[in-house]
Amino acid sequence: MNLTDYVNEVSLEDFAKPFKHHAYWNKRLRTTGGRFFPKDGHLDFNPKMFQEFGQETFRRIVRHELCHYHLYFEGKGYQHKDLDFKRLLKEVDGLRYAPRSTKERGSINYRCQKCGHCYKRQRRINLQKYVCSFCRGHLKEINQSKD
């Protein structure tokens, strides 16, 4: 079963209304479970939420996005701040907030070979291009935290 069919199934079971647009996986999403696009009505979902938290949590994320979807097309308040949205979300047992990932991003540590200053970065530094900002000495990777 593809994602659009799954979202339509959830919509019919939990809202008794069809989902008439498309649903897509969007691997660029990081902190959110999904997004609703009012302009064309499609939904994007974060595949990491499904992989990390499982089917039941993902179903609750789908319900959350479907609340936005159905309220928008009914002409009611579909934003998080609207009472219509809050009521419908509670009624269908959707998630209010996306769960936080338990995986921590690793950091990379660099040390200047001349003055010993340490730099902590989340992204790699091109050691051929960049130097220490204090003494212009060469940098060296000293260790990398585990993901």
Swiss-Prot record:
Residues annotated as domain SprT-like: 5-142
InterPro entries tied to this protein: SprT-like_domain (IPR006640), Uncharacterised_SprT-like (IPR023524)
SMART domains recorded: SprT (SM00731)
Subcellular location(s) per record: Cytoplasm
Keyword Chaperone: no
Cofactor(s) demanded: Zn(2+)
Cofactor note: Binds 1 zinc ion.
Entry binding sites for Zn(2+): H64, H68
Protein's UniProt keywords contain Cytoplasm: yes
Catalytic residues, chain numbering: E65
Keywords (A to Z) from UniProt: Cytoplasm, Metal-binding, Zinc
A single GO cellular-component term on record: cytoplasm
One MF term in the entry's GO annotations: zinc ion binding
GO BP term, pick one: response to stress
Pfam families: SprT-like
Protein family: Belongs to the SprT family.
NCBIfam families in the cross-refs: PRK04351.1
Protein name, entry field: Protein SprT-like
Species name: Streptococcus uberis (strain ATCC BAA-854 / 0140J)
